[in-house]
């Protein structure tokens, strides 16, 4: 288990109103993000066939290498074990490619357990900290026009499989552009070779669970300036819509519309930004005449929340925060005189609810 990062302490608070929205946001890391979380529950209704593709990322690129992150989150309620895995099909006639630098965290847990912590928080912390396990894919050799298997796992009935894989696709030979497909595949038979599943993805279920394939995996969010000693501020991140007017918030970047069109229709908004890194820049103005300590908290605004935060090179687990009366102080920052910026990165645990409040106060 690679998610041994220390856990911060939860507390209580009454968050200040009104909220301020994120000022602006733009994509950060160009590592691709594929999110496979719909259908989340695999049963006779959502997964009627013997096997199928849960989601895919279709890639065409002139680059010499492409970096990927794939997050999956599926619950087996089929009444029998399921085989779930990750494959890559090279569809190019002009080159061979190779899957390298694979790191992954896979959690298979009873779906009736505390999956927010046992799977979601663990995936977020290990990915954000860079402590996922190295993995030698099942097919490490160069792939021509064929399907390679990265890994397959058995998921018992009544269990969740949550995973994050990071890897790099490199050109092994040839000089033509990349054309390949990454798939999450599943089969009711343990004897099925998941390499043979090359169908289009299952239809999205009626639940609001997200899925999609985006050419980036990080949000760079700028929140409005905080003034030391002034009114306590609560900023609202990871929201579905703005508080007033209903227009999309600035940080809603992982939408069905921004999902790579090569992967076709069927994407669903990733409002909570599961699998993505959410990097916050907080401008702080200190005109008090002396350095001042500022406290930064996170506070759930849509239901139960957990995750991880990176401060510099250190990563901490954010504990389960059940209600909007719960909070976790993630940092104490000594603001110098004048204008400075405090930066930190968040990753939301699978099964969390958003929006998330970022609460800023001056230490008394």
Language model regions located:
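C-terminal functional regions that serve as terminal interaction/effector modules
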Residues: 2-13, 17, 284-364
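N-terminal, Lys/Arg-enriched amphipathic/low-complexity engagement segments
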Residues: 4-63
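Asparagine-centered strand-capping/turn motif at beta-strand->loop junctions
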Residues: 74-82, 87-107, 167-171, 283-288, ...
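Short, solvent-exposed loop/turn segments enriched in Ser/Thr/Gly
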Residues: 77-85, 159-163, 274-280, 340
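Short, hydrophobic/aromatic beta-strand segments
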Residues: 83-85, 94-102, 163, 175-181, ...
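Short aromatic-acidic-glycine turn motif
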Residues: 105-123, 189-193, 302-312
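Intrinsically disordered, low-complexity Pro/Gly/Ser/Thr-rich segments with frequent PxxP/GP/PP motifs
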Residues: 115-158, 313-343
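Acidic, serine/threonine- and glycine-rich low-complexity intrinsically disordered segments
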Residues: 148-267, 271
């Amino acid at each position: 288990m690679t998610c041994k990062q220390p856990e911060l302490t939860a507390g209580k608070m009454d968050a200040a109103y009104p909220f301020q929205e994120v000022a602006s946001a733009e994509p950060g890391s160009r590592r691709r993000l594929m999110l496979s979380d719909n259908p989340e529950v695999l049963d006779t209704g959502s997964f009627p066939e013997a096997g199928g593709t849960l989601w895919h990322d279709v890639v065409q690129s002139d680059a010499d290498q492409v970096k990927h992150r794939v997050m999956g989150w599926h619950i087996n309620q089929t009444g029998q074990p399921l085989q779930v895995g990750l494959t890559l099909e090279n569809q190019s006639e002009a080159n061979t490619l190779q899957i390298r630098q694979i790191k992954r965290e896979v959690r298979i847990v009873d779906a009736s357990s505390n999956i927010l912590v046992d799977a979601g928080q663990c995936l977020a912390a290990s990915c954000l900290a860079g402590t996922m396990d190295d993995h030698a894919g099942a097919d490490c050799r160069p792939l021509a026009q064929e399907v390679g298997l990265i890994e397959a796992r058995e998921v018992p009935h009544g269990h969740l499989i949550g995973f994050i894989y990071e890897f790099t696709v490199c050109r092994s030979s040839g000089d033509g552009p990349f054309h390949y497909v990454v798939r999450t595949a599943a089969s009711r038979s343990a004897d099925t070779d998941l390499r043979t599943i090359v169908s289009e993805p299952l239809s999205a279920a009626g639940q609001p669970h997200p899925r999609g394939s985006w050419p980036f995996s990080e949000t760079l969010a700028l929140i409005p300036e905080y003034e030391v000693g002034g009114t306590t501020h609560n900023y609202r991140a990871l929201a579905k819509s703005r508080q007033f007017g209903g227009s999309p918030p600035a940080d809603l970047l992982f939408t069905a519309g921004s999902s790579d069109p090569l992967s076709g229709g069927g994407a669903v908004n990733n409002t909570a930004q599961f699998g993505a890194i959410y990097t916050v820049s907080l401008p702080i103005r200190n005109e008090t005449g002396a350095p001042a300590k500022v406290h930064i908290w996170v506070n759930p605004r849509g239901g139960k929340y957990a995750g991880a935060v990176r401060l510099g090179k250190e990563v901490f687990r954010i504990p389960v925060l059940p209600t909007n009366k719960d909070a976790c102080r993630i940092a104490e920052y000594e603001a110098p005189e004048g204008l400075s910026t405090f930066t930190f990165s968040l990753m939301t645990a699978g099964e969390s609810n958003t929006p998330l409040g970022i609460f800023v106060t001056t230490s008394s």
